[in-house]
């Protein structure tokens, strides 16, 4: 279960999405994005993680129960955290994902852009910060192993994390862009 073999494919996927002009929820949180578009991207990105997880229920016969139980244990562990921790961990993820997307967009070439993305993603994974879209995928995998009440609690937790992701992106925009424009 090393970070590089299990979680780094997410970093590669983010690079692919950005390279092909895709929109990432945590990447646009800090941009001047209308709330309606932000909500729409949240739903679409969430579906992009939830649908493959649900499909995996029927396609992975051996190990599906074990995978679901592991994902459930992860989600229940997160539920044991203080809601302020969810918000702050979401905020820090939002900061790093904003830096990833801005770093990618402002990079002088693709190699530097990819390095910015991978640096930010490794940072939020190693630090244990919370990413609302990723947590939707974990929840979808865990659903067969959770009670209805636990699913509702996880959904509430993901909403708090999502707010943290948004606040983190907005905070970085204030620090890096808005204050500079104000001083100019």
Give, region by region, the residue ranges found by the protein language model:
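Alpha-helical transmembrane segments and their helix-helix packing motifs
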Residues: 1-184
């Amino acid at each position: 279960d090393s970070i590089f073999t299990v979680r780094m494919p997410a970093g590669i996927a983010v690079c692919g999405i950005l390279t092909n002009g895709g929109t990432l929820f945590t990447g646009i949180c800090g941009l001047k994005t209308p709330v309606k578009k932000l909500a729409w991207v949240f739903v679409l990105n969430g579906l992009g993680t939830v649908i493959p997880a649900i499909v995996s229920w029927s396609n992975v016969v051996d190990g599906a129960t074990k995978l679901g139980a592991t994902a459930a244990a992860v989600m229940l562990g997160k539920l044991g955290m203080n809601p302020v921790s969810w918000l702050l961990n979401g905020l820090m993820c939002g900061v790093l994902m904003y830096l990833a997307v801005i770093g990618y967009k402002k990079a002088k070439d693709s190699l530097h852009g990819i390095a910015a993305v991978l640096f930010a993603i490794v940072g939020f994974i190693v630090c244990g910060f919370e990413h609302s879209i990723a947590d939707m995928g974990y929840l979808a995998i865990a659903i067969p192993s959770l009670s209805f009440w636990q699913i509702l609690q996880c959904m509430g937790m993901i909403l708090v994390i999502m707010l943290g992701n948004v606040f983190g992106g907005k905070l970085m925009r204030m620090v890096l862009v808005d204050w500079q424009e104000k001083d100019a």
